[in-house]
Regions:
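TPR repeat positional signature
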Residues: 15, 49, 53-56
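Extended alpha-helical scaffolding segments
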Residues: 50, 58-67
Length: 117
């Protein structure tokens, strides 16, 4: 039986891979959707949480989106400490288009992964 951590890590990696594939296709909406889903999955894992915000910063830089760039720089500072202390807004999609403090509903398929076996 796979552990919750293994399943969570694999699903996070899949979402990141899908985001990269969307970027290569030039599908910015799908890229962001997969980055947001990766963010939801990454919140309990400090390293992956930070890496997801780095990817979101890259998204903002490629789009020359000043708001996203600034938002991700701020989130990069607080991502790891938030994970370590358990003080992160569960379900938050991580983009600068939403408050960094706002909890959000988690899609059912991601909730199943977060709940584990």
């Amino acid at each position: 039986m796979r552990s919750k951590h293994t399943e969570l890590t694999e699903r996070w990696a899949k979402e990141r891979s899908e985001a990269r594939a969307a970027r290569r296709r030039g599908d910015v909406e799908d890229e962001l959707r997969h980055l947001e889903r990766a963010h939801v999955l990454s919140q309990p894992m400090a390293g992956r949480h930070v890496r997801t915000h780095v990817a979101m910063l890259g998204y903002g830089l490629r789009r020359r989106d000043r708001r996203e760039i600034i938002g991700q720089l701020v989130r990069l500072v607080v991502a790891a400490p938030g994970t370590w202390t358990g003080r992160y807004p569960v379900g938050n999609t991580g983009g600068a288009n939403v408050s960094a403090l706002k909890p959000m509903p988690i899609p059912d398929d991601l909730q199943a992964v977060l709940n584990g076996p």
